Amino acid sequence: MILLRAKVPLPAKVTLRITGNTMGNSLLPKHIKHITVPPVKCQGIKTKLVNFIASSISWEGKGKWIEPFLGSGVTAFNILAPKALLADTNPHIINLYRQIQKREIDRNTVKEFLEFHGAKLEKGDGDYYYEIREQFNRTKDPLLFLFLNRASFNGLMRFNANGNFNVPYNHKPNRFSKAYISKICNQVSTLQNILMCVDWEFITAPWEHTIAQANANDFVYLDPPYIGRSSDYYNSWSYEDALKLSTQIHSLPCGYAMSMWLKNKFRTNEYIDNFRTKDEILTFNHFYHIGASETLRNSIVEALIIKPGYSNKQNFGNVKLYLQEEIALDNMWDKKSQNDLYSQRLHRFHR
């Protein structure tokens, strides 16, 4: 097992230099010039880590890109494999993306829907939000799901034991401003254009069923719920589930990579010990937010676990670019926190 830690000095001024190139004829590794942001928001979304993931994996792209924990879909929407099997146990995410794929939902339907209900929300405040939430739990309408996803507290996506959405209202004035609606519509339109050019299947299925479809030329990317942290997983996720997953992925006939948190300032994820002797691990430091205040920013070390033979060794000298992108994506960081985070240079060690 090789554990690689990505830390570099903070540049004085952030200037992104994007190549947008793949290496040879392979799909991965590559660097993505413009990150596609999905219309669905999830906690733990990998927007800031997309280029880190895409540039760390080596895969020819001859088979299917398989994701058993799709979540927002941000990784798949940026990897852009010609063929993909994208699954989640959350039927509402899958239903929304299927309807966008079939063009039953497009930017115009989203614009009209959000403008109408956004105006009523502004007048009715929390009461109207809870009316919409109750209506969604009865009808499962994908547009209502999108509305709740953008109007709920802190972008949470949480369901009770009966499968009902139960996140409270986000008391933010002018929640569905003209600019915000345009942003969501653009995200829907971008995704729809992608789906017109690829052969992707969206399914509601447990992860066991999904990875069982993998063949030799495929690649499985896994972003399971983080043990010990709140997650958006539609069903429960236990330590026993995680152990079962670690056993089964080591039996896959194809390449795989798994995202996981390694440690934060409070503790270390001991579950990662299941991969230390069999896989290569690349780590990446970044901040996550649990609120608008600077005091609520926390650093976390993310790990990308990769099957031997499927990692891009040349990527290890290019980590500076990904860190520059993260700084550009998050202008709320203060300079002291940045300098503390990037005080060390890239280094390797063997276990």
Segments predicted by a language model, with ranges:
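A short helix-to-beta-strand connector/capping loop
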Residues: P82, I194-W200, T277-D279
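Residues lining hydrophobic/aromatic ligand-binding pockets adjacent to catalytic sites
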Residues: H171, H209-I211, P224-S246, N264-T268
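SAM-dependent nucleic-acid methyltransferase catalytic core
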Residues: L16-W59, E104-Y221, P225-S230, R345
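Short, solvent-exposed loop/turn segments at secondary-structure junctions
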Residues: S72-T75, N90-I93, A151-N154, W207-T210, ...
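Short glycine/proline-enriched coil/turn segments at helix->beta-strand junctions
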Residues: W59-K62, I79-A84, A214-D218, H250-G255, ...
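Long, positively charged, glycine-interspersed low-complexity recognition regions
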Residues: S238-H350
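Intrinsically disordered, low-complexity proline-rich tandem-repeat tracts
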Residues: I2-R5, L10, T15-R17
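SAM cofactor-binding core of SAM-dependent methyltransferases
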Residues: G63-D127
